[in-house]
């Protein structure tokens, strides 16, 4: 009897497991009315989306050499060409302020970067390492490791839906008297918006999985030349979901 009961429960669980979906978005982790999340999203609207990855690159050769900088340039271009990547910022994009040596009044008209043939790489190395703007952000203290920021494309529809949801929630929470018809309409709109947001989250989750995989494949091409690591919120969320999905498959069989 006990074995029959266990078998029945296993069958029921297995049927429901196929419909189980994981949501790694912030919506699944906080309440709809969370003020901190709202403030965070308002900052994103003002200053831009914060979806990005960080690539650290430590070449086997001298970082500030023409060969290493050429490899970084190639990697940067390869990453830019990946669908889903909006832009890439690297040490090559960092302006060199005092190469060649000019007066402070002329600095703005003479900004160059490491790709400029007039720049002395040895002097540029010292300037970048000792620049508080760059230090421990795009360059390590010892000048051997640099970082690249891979900015991911946002989803305009998602942002619009989030804003619409906040507007509805504010109306429902306001002290302004609302008719039953208006309340029902707002609640219906809210339900439709939440459904669409969930759909987008699922689509984005699958897309990010493929995106992270393609970025890793691109980085693998350069691993013979350097020690490379990938990090960032999107990668962590994607990897966590894959670990959980793997556990569900194992424990669900």
Residue ranges and their predicted role:
Residues 52-61, 105-111, 146-154, 195-198:
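Short, hydrophobic beta-strand segments
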Residues 61-137:
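Solvent-exposed, membrane-proximal periplasmic/extracellular interface segments of envelope transport
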Residues 1-22:
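Signature of alpha-helical transmembrane segments and their immediate interfacial
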Residues 2, 17, 50-54, 85, ...:
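A common structural microfeature
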Residues 17-63, 69, 115-138:
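Solvent-exposed, non-transmembrane loop/terminal regulatory segments of multi-pass membrane proteins
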Residues 41, 45, 115-253:
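Extracytoplasmic
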């Amino acid at each position: 009897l006990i074995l029959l009961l266990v078998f029945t429960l296993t069958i029921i669980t297995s049927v429901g497991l196929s419909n189980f979906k994981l949501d790694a978005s912030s919506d699944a982790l906080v309440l709809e009315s969370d003020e901190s999340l709202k403030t965070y999203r308002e900052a994103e609207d003002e200053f831009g989306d914060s979806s990005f990855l960080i690539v650290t690159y430590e070449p086997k050769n001298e970082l500030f050499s023409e060969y290493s900088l050429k490899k970084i340039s190639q990697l940067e271009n390869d990453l830019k060409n990946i669908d889903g990547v909006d832009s890439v910022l690297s040490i090559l994009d960092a302006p060199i302020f005092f190469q060649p040596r000019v007066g402070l009044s002329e600095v703005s008209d003479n900004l160059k970067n490491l790709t400029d043939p007039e720049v002395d790489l040895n002097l540029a190395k010292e300037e970048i390492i000792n620049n508080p703007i760059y230090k421990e952000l795009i360059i390590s203290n010892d000048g051997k490791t640099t970082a690249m920021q891979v900015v991911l494309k946002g989803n305009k529809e998602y942002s619009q839906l989030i804003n619409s949801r906040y507007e509805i929630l504010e109306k429902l929470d306001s002290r302004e008297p609302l008719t039953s018809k208006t309340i029902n309409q707002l609640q219906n709109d809210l339900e439709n918006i939440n459904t669409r947001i969930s759909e987008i989250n699922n689509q984005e989750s699958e897309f990010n999985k493929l995106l992270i995989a393609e970025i890793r494949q691109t980085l693998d091409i350069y691993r013979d030349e350097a020690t490379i690591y990938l990090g960032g919120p999107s990668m962590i969320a994607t990897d966590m979901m894959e670990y959980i999905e793997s556990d569900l498959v194992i424990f669900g069989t």
